[in-house]
């Protein structure tokens, strides 16, 4: 199971946890994925994982 947006390809990023003493340990920033239903041209329905930022953009462009 890949944590990747089906439309934009947005995936995990790598960064650091930084403590108060400035110690750094690696961590991953995961995209905010949402499962949505999409109706294809042939009438079938599929579930895809889409980032929340992609959903906002799609909603903005549909108006």
Curated annotation (Swiss-Prot):
Pfam families attached to this UniProt entry: Ribosomal_L28
Superkingdom classification of source: Bacteria
Keywords: Ribonucleoprotein, Ribosomal protein
InterPro entries for this protein: Bacterial_rp_bL28, Ribosomal_bL28, Ribosomal_bL28/bL31-like_sf, Ribosomal_bL28_bact-type, Ribosomal_bL28_sf
Molecular function per GO: structural constituent of ribosome
Keyword Ribonucleoprotein attributed: yes
Gene3D superfamilies attached to this UniProt entry: 2.20.150.30, Ribosomal protein L28/L24 (2.30.170.40)
GO cellular component: ribonucleoprotein complex; ribosome
Swiss-Prot/TrEMBL GO biological process terms: translation
Disordered as annotated region, ranges: 1-20
Family: Belongs to the bacterial ribosomal protein bL28 family.
Family matches, as NCBIfam families: L28
Name this polypeptide is given: Large ribosomal subunit protein bL28
Source species taxonomy: Bacteria, Pseudomonadati, Campylobacterota, Epsilonproteobacteria, Campylobacterales
